[in-house]
């Protein structure tokens, strides 16, 4: 991306050279800062992409669930249990249910279908904070990738019959046809409500209702690659068109800090 200068992430701002600090200060926009730098840039009034919310809610299932609840976004019944309340889980949920690691459970890892007390005990040995969710029977889920709140790709993920997780890394099969507009509208509305402007949302239809399961900020690129789509080029086009920048900034070069090294 020739319009972007990649500086990389450094733990101390003073580790950047004087020239690099000048570039950051003068950039029209910062691309893909870390969550820490995103907070600093917010205070400074420096435009950046993606949004602060996208950065802060990444890999934070507990925060996402609370946000969905507060915003009224349809989401499976979910409760959080700290160690002293682990015994309440079987009172509140009937087997089977889903248990997830609150963090580091991407690509289908750290997600468990709990069918017995023994499986629950094994899960609780993995995490002091239990994230418990009702099990929604399904044969497939829907991944919707949105950039700047607009869906750029959506596809079904048909799960492997031997695996309850509909994830490509867990053997699911992608299908790109028959995507319902109702689901795309919900995904776009949820992204706007949450202010997630670079995200892969997972949705499931169960009992005639669409549910938003979770938001993935580090969404996989496999689906994009299958359709011959280049995310870097998509972002470049949106950057040059001014879509990613406030209108007052116009079009121009953007100095990239933090995670931009993975995009530029």
Residue map of PLM features:
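Conserved N-proximal alpha/beta basic substrate-recognition cap immediately N-terminal to
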Residues: 1-80, 87
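Short glycine-enriched loops at secondary-structure junctions
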Residues: 33-37, 54, 151, 157-158, ...
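Active-site nucleotide/adenylate-binding loops and adjacent lid/helix of ATP-dependent enzymes
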Residues: 55-141, 181, 237-241
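Protein kinase-like catalytic core scaffold
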Residues: 97, 153, 211-213
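Anionic group-transfer/hydrolysis microenvironments
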Residues: 102, 135-136, 145, 202-204, ...
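Phosphate-binding site of ATP-dependent enzymes
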Residues: 111-191
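A short glycine-rich, hydrophobically flanked beta-strand micro-motif that places a catalytic Asp/Glu
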Residues: 196-207
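C-terminal active-site "lid" helix and adjoining low-complexity regulatory extension at the edge
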Residues: 205-264
């Amino acid at each position: 991306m020739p319009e972007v200068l990649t500086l990389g992430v450094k733990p101390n701002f003073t580790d950047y050279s004087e020239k690099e600090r000048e570039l950051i200060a003068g950039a029209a926009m910062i691309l893909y800062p870390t969550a820490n730098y995103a907070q600093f840039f917010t205070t400074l009034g420096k435009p950046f992409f993606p949004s602060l919310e996208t950065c802060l809610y990444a890999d934070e299932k507990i925060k996402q669930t609370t946000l969905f609840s507060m915003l009224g976004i349809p989401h499976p019944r979910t409760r959080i249990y700290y160690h002293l309340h682990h015994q309440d889980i079987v009172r509140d949920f009937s087997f089977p249910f889903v248990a997830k690691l609150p963090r580091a459970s991407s690509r289908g890892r750290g997600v468990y279908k709990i069918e017995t007390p023994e499986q629950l005990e094994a899960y609780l040995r993995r995490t002091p904070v239990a994230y418990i969710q009702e099990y929604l029977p399904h044969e497939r889920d829907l991944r919707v990738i949105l950039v700047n709140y607009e869906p750029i790709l959506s596809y079904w993920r048909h799960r492997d019959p031997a695996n309850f997780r509909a994830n490509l890394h867990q053997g699911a099969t992608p299908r790109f046809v028959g995507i319902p507009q109702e689901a795309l509208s919900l995904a776009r509305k949820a992204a706007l409500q949450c202010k997630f402007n670079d995200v892969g949302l997972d949705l499931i239809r169960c009992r005639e209702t669409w549910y938003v399961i979770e938001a993935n900020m580090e969404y996989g690129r496999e689906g994009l690659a299958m359709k011959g789509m280049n995310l870097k080029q998509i972002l470049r086009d949106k950057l040059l068109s001014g879509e990613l920048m406030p209108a007052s900034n116009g079009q121009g070069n953007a100095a990239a800090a933090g995670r931009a090294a993975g995009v530029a």
